[in-house]
Amino acid sequence: MSKNQQYAEQYADFAMEQMRRYGIPASVTLAQGILESSNGQSRLAQNENNHFGIKATPAWIAEGGRYGIYTDDKPNEKFCSYDSVGDSYEHHSRFLVENKRYDRCFALAPDDYKGWTEGLAKAGYA
């Protein structure tokens, strides 16, 4: 079994829960998690339970959100730290829901993974 398959199998329940709650295709969420976290093996995923590379905003920090400091695009960037992988999946979904640039995606059906991936790319998802 490939590392991608192992990741998808291990975290499928989290992705399915997010699909039920928010309508985001589980396959899209898993694909983003696979890419962003190197199949859950990145330092950010291992140390901070952050599977989507979500950066800690000033609002996150002001509300008491924990963060780790890593070099990504620039040195010493702040990334959200979560108590669990499930919290990371939930924050990823809320990030998409609360960001107006992704609104068009939410007009699509949860089984329209192609439309979702195109919509996310057009909206500028990194």
Model region roles, listed by residue range:
Residues 1-126:
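Catalytic cores of secreted/periplasmic lytic hydrolases that degrade extracellular macromolecules
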